[in-house]
Amino acid sequence: MTIGPDTITVVSGLPRTGTSMMMQMLEAGGMVILTDRIRVADEDNRKGYYEYEKVKSLKSDQNWLADASGKVVKIISELLQYLPGSYTYKIVFMERDILEVLASQDQMLLRRGIESAGEVDDRQIAQIFEKHLAETRSWLEQKPSMETLYINHNDVLASPLVQAKRIDSFLGNALDVNHMASVIDPGLYRQRR
């Protein structure tokens, strides 16, 4: 599958897996980002969220996807199932240790004054997330209009240039990989396992 002006590049994954970090890399690499910048940077995402509000209503409204052609948009994994087969997609799917995801979400909630559900609930949520990810991976494999590259959050932090080259190869070898790698700040990696 080649990337062209009609291809929609999607950054996906669970929340708190590095999707905003990947959007930042792709923007630095030269891609056009589809974002409205309504949700601004904060303590939880110091470099911004790169979200597009219309994504939240993807289930009921896909008309905005025409504006995404030739661009990159962030869509959480739960919403991928609502992407119509009438477009071609290149999906950069972010992966991260589930316990780190949960720890990051807990910290985000605490900063907003909401208590964590606790360790027992974290194990249950981890099982739900693992099941969702397995089902999503299986679903993506069956979609001829979608090609997916899986990128590990920790691998990006450990070797940003190597991962930037993988992403560039997947997206057609037209990105500035050095600039992509230069935007990675390992100091923002706060929830480790």
Residue ranges and their predicted role:
Residues 37-39, 55-61, 78, 104-108, ...:
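A generic structural micro-environment signature
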Residues 72-175:
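PAPS-dependent sulfotransferase catalytic domain
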